[in-house]
Amino acid sequence: MTNEIKIANALLTEMQDINYGWVDFTGKTHLGDFDSFSDDYRLQSPASLQKSKAGVCWDQVEFERDYFKEHNISIKTYFLVYYNGKDCPTHTFLVFKSNGEFYWFEHSWERFRGLHQYQNIDELLSDVVHKFIKSEIKDGDFNSTNLNVHEYTQPNYGLSVQEFYAFCDNGTYIDISY
């Protein structure tokens, strides 16, 4: 087992007490209540997430980014969004490379929590996109022109939902074949 894999597994263990939820601009934690998310959400810093113990994938990826950076492991982060004119589901996730293999590190998406190994980045991205489509988009409603994938860099903390979308959409567009 490589050092990167050991560190990634240690992070999964460290994140066990972090729940899927969000913190609003007043500092109130919301678990399971997303009614005011689009108006009141603000992106947390890693220290804030560690304190609140609740974050959506956007917050959790920033915590993960910080952890991997502290351990000198190069990573990339990706933003998936399906612009359907309604709820516009999203997912962010982190990828790293170890010993020639690519790894999808996943904590927030509980169904797929863990480390997932791939031969190349295209295989990894395609798999995550297919899982996202199958899990988040109703059968028959999928239109590939509405799905966007961007690689993005570290955002400023405190961004609103709209600001976070705009930031990620300004990242590097990734063309994924379905």
Where are the regions a protein language model picked out?
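A structural boundary/capping signal
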Residues: M1-Y178
